[in-house]
Amino acid sequence: MSIGLVILVAVVALLLVVGYGTAVLMRKRNEALLQNLEERKEALYNLPVNDEVEEVKNMHLIGQSQVAFREWNQKWVDLSLNSFADIENNLFEAEGYNNSFRFIKAKHAIGNIESQIDLIEEDIKMIRAALEDLKEQESKNSGRVLHALDLFEKLQTQVAENADSYGQALAEIEKQLENIQSEFSQFVTLNSSGDPVEAAEILDKAEDHILALTHIVEKVPAIVEELTVKLPDQLEDLESGHRKLLESGYHFIETDIESRFQQLHASLKRNEANISALELDNAEYENEQAQEEINALYEIFTREIEAHKVVEKLIKNLPSYLAHTKENNQQLQKEIERLSQTFLISDTETSHVKELQAELSAQEDVVLSAVEDSSETKQAYSVVQEELEAIQERLKEIEDEQISLGEALAEIEKDDANARQKVNIYANKLHTIKRYMEKRNLPGIPDSFLEIFFSTSNNIEELVKELEATRVNIESVNRWLEILGNDMEQLEEETYRIVQDATLTEQLLQYSNRYRSFDDNVQAAFNKSLYVFEHDYDYAQSLEIISKALDLVEPGVTERFVTSYEKTRENIRF
């Protein structure tokens, strides 16, 4: 055998060995894939879908829910009977291909099986999700119905146990309970006949009616109690109180109280219709209106009762208060009479006291009448209170006026004493100012001073005449005092001004000697200033002439002399 042939045989043998090994490996790999697919199929088949279907089936669904269940149930039946069988056949066929080393067909078959299992897996997920949704929806529907029934039963029990508290509303409440019961019956009929949409609408209405009626049932007792117990009790109390007040002598400004009682009775009676019709908002409003009217009547009675207390107190206190003011007026009259012996009293004060006396007499008639007729008055106490309080307020005003008059009268003698003291002071001041001027040894007295001086002197004489009159006019005296005060102030200022101007002129004339010998302007000013000083007695003009001339040659000299003078000026010693 040639070497070439040997090599060829060896190569063929090697290829056969390699091919066989590869075939064995591929078959094992496909076996593993097929085993995995078998396990996936078994896992899907063993899911509790049948149990879930039976659970939903036993819920006895109706209407659209039942239609949906049938569709999903049929889908599951198709899967469990057909799809799984197909997969089983395909697995068996793929195993045959694999065992016979037909790997291409085996691979293709395995791919198809994987796709089938993936589709079945998705379908099962959808079926189970749909079944779960049906269970949840049914549970919700059942729970909703049970909840509504529970609320309805509680409402029925509540109404039955508290029937007396609903009054006129009970009949309408029971009627609405029957209507709700009918709605439940209608719901059951529609639901059983496979019309879930309309059944749901009926259930919605029933639930709404239950909630609304529950709210009504909770509100009615309080409104009924207000209408049938509280308001009638208050009205009865008002009518009883009104009778007692009338028997006790009370009167009222309002003349329609009895008719208002009748209107309240009618209003309460009419409001029963709102209760019967369950018009609770209207019923509450009518109750509130009735309560407001009752409160208004209570306020009327309370007003008169409180006014009676005030009237009794005023009747007790006003006579003594009136007597007090009358006594004050008598004292004022006596004081005016006493002062009239010495002073002229103004007609205003005299007439004021007389007017007060006349007013007090008129007030006395009213007060005494009120005191005497207090137990038999035909007026409402609030009216009497207003009248008596007005009198009391006026008496307070009169008392204040009396105090002011008394103070004014007391000032008359004080003003007289003050005037007599001041007239002496002013006379002494006038004499002192005269001596002060004389001591200055001036060449003459300016007319401005003499005019003020003699005017002041004349005014002092006039004041003395007023004070020496048989009956002193104190108003005139006070006017003269005011005039004299201004006169003395003006005279004192004029005196200081004249003396200052004269003194400074003399000092500056003497000071100018140091400049007159060589300054013609100063010499001329000296001559003119001296002439005015000695002949015109115009010391201010004289000072102005010499000061201007000196300030030209020695600026500030006049200011220096003025400052020095003010520090050493001699004051008038009164």
Curated annotation (Swiss-Prot):
Indicate the segments annotated as coiled coil, or none if absent. Answer: 26-47, 105-189, 258-346, 375-415, 455-494
A Gene Ontology BP annotation from the UniProt entry: septin ring assembly
Which residue ranges does UniProt annotate as crossing the membrane?
8-26
What spans does the record annotate as topological domain Extracellular, numbered to this chain? 1-7
Give the highest taxon in the source lineage: Bacteria
Chain ranges sitting on the Cytoplasmic side read: 27-574
Its chief place of residence is membrane
Places the protein is found: Cell membrane
Which keywords does the record carry? Answer: Cell cycle, Cell division, Cell membrane, Coiled coil, Membrane, Septation, Transmembrane, Transmembrane helix
What does the UniProt record say this protein does? Negative regulator of FtsZ ring formation; modulates the frequency and position of FtsZ ring formation. Inhibits FtsZ ring formation at polar sites. Interacts either with FtsZ or with one of its binding partners to promote depolymerization.
Tell me its family: Belongs to the EzrA family.
Entry protein name:
Septation ring formation regulator EzrA
Q: Which gene encodes it?
A: ezrA
